């Protein structure tokens, strides 16, 4: 189904008086800002422990599978592209393409999550590195697990939009804002992972890093 393209400003949007920005979008930006600070604290916490030596068990940086995690990171990065394509499709009123790209984004996010579950399983069963092995392992699992939870929430939101579009034969002007908010959230999750992958995986696993 193809519907008229959405205009830049929907009449249903509730603008914040002082900023001229839609109130729900402003709230999302505020939420993401607080999450950015929280992730920053978790990354800092991991870095504080990553350079220390512990008697018990391996440190995460000693057992990373960088090629595998690189593929997972690429998959998540591509999901940002499909999210943009979903937004653009709805902007021009192409409801069918919107559903296709929403589903593609959710599937790519699910593949990333499956990769993370596989990585955790390998670390626990083969490398005997659990949450309680040492502070470095604990910091790693908390950081990456917290990010994985955000990805899972994003996948649920994407599938909800996909299901709503199927049930109503398209997304309305009001729901266009919902897609924009989900898009903001999803891009944030992707950017945070790029930071985590670079700082936590690549830099700490580099020769001489710890």
Question: Where in the sequence are the language-model features?
Answer:
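...captures the hydrophobic TM-helix bundle architecture rather than a specific catalytic motif
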Residues: 1-210
């Amino acid at each position: 189904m193809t519907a008229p393209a959405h205009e830049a400003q929907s009449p249903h949007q509730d603008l914040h008086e002082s900023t001229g920005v839609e109130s729900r979008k402003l709230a999302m930006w505020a939420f993401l800002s607080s999450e950015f600070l929280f992730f920053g604290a978790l990354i800092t916490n991991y870095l504080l422990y990553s350079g220390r030596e512990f008697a018990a068990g391996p440190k995460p940086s000693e057992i990373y599978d960088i090629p595998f995690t690189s593929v997972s990171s690429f998959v998540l990065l591509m999901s940002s592209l499909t999210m943009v394509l979903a937004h653009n499709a709805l902007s021009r009123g192409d409801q069918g393409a919107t559903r296709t790209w929403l589903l593609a984004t959710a599937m790519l996010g699910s593949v990333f999550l499956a990769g993370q579950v596989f990585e955790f399983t390998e670390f626990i069963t083969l490398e005997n590195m659990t949450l309680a092995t040492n502070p470095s392992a604990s910091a790693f699992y908390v950081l990456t697990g917290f990010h994985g939870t955000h990805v899972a929430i994003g996948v649920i939101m994407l599938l909800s939009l996909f299901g709503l579009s199927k049930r109503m034969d398209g997304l309305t002007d009001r729901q266009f804002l919902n897609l924009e908010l989900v898009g903001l959230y999803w891009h944030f999750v992707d950017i945070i992972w790029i930071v985590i992958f670079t700082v936590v995986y690549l830099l700490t696993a580099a020769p001489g890093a710890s």
